[in-house]
């Protein structure tokens, strides 16, 4: 335990919190343009072809964003919205594409968890 005199001379140093999503710059989402749309394979023990895209953001950052859901309509020069949230089995992918916003369509025939995939309610 430090004495009062020690604390007067040299105060305690606050720990600086490091952001997991630096490219968002404390914003909830950011807009960007797809520079490359491709598939990649996850780390062991998983196996799949995960859909991802390289995005040039409005603030100049270039990041990799995961495209969730079954099927998508993204291609090069598509304007998309990204949010934070990493993909655990894809190293370097720290952002998610927001489905149903800007040029990214919602997931076709989605019935459950629709709000996460940009799908409006189907009126019966």
UniProtKB/Swiss-Prot annotation:
Species name: Erwinia amylovora (Fire blight bacteria)
Modified-residue entries (3-methylthioaspartic acid), positions: 89
Source domain of life: Bacteria
Pfam families per UniProt: Ribosom_S12_S23
Gene Ontology biological-process annotations: translation
UniProt GO cellular component terms: small ribosomal subunit
Subunit structure: Part of the 30S ribosomal subunit. Contacts proteins S8 and S17. May interact with IF1 in the 30S initiation complex.
Role of this protein: With S4 and S5 plays an important role in translational accuracy.
Keyword tags: Methylation, Ribonucleoprotein, Ribosomal protein, RNA-binding, rRNA-binding, tRNA-binding
InterPro entries: NA-bd_OB-fold (IPR012340), Ribosomal_uS12 (IPR006032), Ribosomal_uS12_bac (IPR005679)
GO molecular function ontology, one term from the record: structural constituent of ribosome
Family membership: Belongs to the universal ribosomal protein uS12 family.
Protein name (Swiss-Prot/TrEMBL): Small ribosomal subunit protein uS12
């Amino acid at each position: 335990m430090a004495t009062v005199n020690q604390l007067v001379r040299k105060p305690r140093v606050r720990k600086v919190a490091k952001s997991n999503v630096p490219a968002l710059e404390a914003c909830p989402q950011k807009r960007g343009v797809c520079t490359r749309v491709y598939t990649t394979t996850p780390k062991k023990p998983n196996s799949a072809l995960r859909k991802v895209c390289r995005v040039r953001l409005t603030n100049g950052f270039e990041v990799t964003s995961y495209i969730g859901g079954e099927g998508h309509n993204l291609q090069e020069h598509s304007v998309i919205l990204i949010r934070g949230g990493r993909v655990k089995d894809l190293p370097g992918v720290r952002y998610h594409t927001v489905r149903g916003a800007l040029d990214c369509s919602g997931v076709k025939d989605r019935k459950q968890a629709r709000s996460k995939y940009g799908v409006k309610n189907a009126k019966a």
